[in-house]
Design a protein with these regions (language model features):
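Active-site helical microenvironments for divalent-metal-assisted chemistry
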Residues: 2-200
Length: 200
């Protein structure tokens, strides 16, 4: 009898696990628009990891939410970019989003049954943006991007980002007083950075 691995409540064969990890590895290779504080492009995987960390750290701020589910959504939310690469938000079209979603869903449908059902349910909830868990994920997704820009050298910013930094994600934090406070704090940081570092 072939060995099975229990991963997050999902039983799968080691070969199936390795196949999923092989796709996920592409998120380490594919870079995003933003730079890290060390001056290199950040990877999609790094972004996904940090919003997952943010969700873990905020567990006690949202005691009524299923933060384990939020973390799971955060971990897989950009898996489509393993196939398409990252497209900056100010360039991404609805057609790009549909293409990414379709490619990801086609891949999810090839997963072992339990994994397929869980991933499909998480992605459906994520895209519907109706539950508190989905709203928390989306707010963290937006905030992490702004935070990373604040951590990067301002010379890497595009002209449009001076305004975008202050408005990006604003609508996504309105559901939560805590998220509104976080956005306000990040905006203060942004203004200080611009005042200090913006080229003349």
């Amino acid at each position: 009898m072939r060995a099975l691995i229990l991963l997050g409540g999902i039983k799968m064969k080691p070969k199936e696990l390795l196949e999923i990890l092989s796709v996920a590895e592409k998120l380490k290779c594919n870079t995003r628009h933003c730079y890290t504080s060390s001056g290199r492009r950040e990877s999609v995987a790094e972004h996904s990891w940090r919003i997952s960390l943010m969700a873990m750290l905020l567990t006690k701020e949202f005691p009524e939410a299923d933060m384990d589910k939020v973390i799971r959504i955060c971990l897989i939310h950009d898996m489509g970019e393993a196939f398409t690469g990252d497209i900056p938000t100010f360039e991404k079209t609805n057609a790009d989003t549909r293409k990414e979603d379709d490619i990801l869903l086609n891949w999810v449908n090839t997963l072992p049954e339990d994994a397929r059902e869980e991933w499909a349910a998480l992605l459906t909830e994520m895209n519907a943006m109706e539950t508190q868990e989905a709203k928390i994920y989306k707010a963290l997704d937006k905030m992490e991007a702004v935070i990373q820009h604040n951590e990067s050298d301002i010379s890497t910013w595009l002209p449009l980002e001076y305004d975008l930094q202050l408005t990006y994600g604003e609508e996504n934090v309105q559901f939560s007083p805590y998220m509104q406070q976080l956005k306000a704090e990040v905006n203060d940081w942004t203004r200080e950075k611009i005042a200090r570092e913006k080229p003349e």
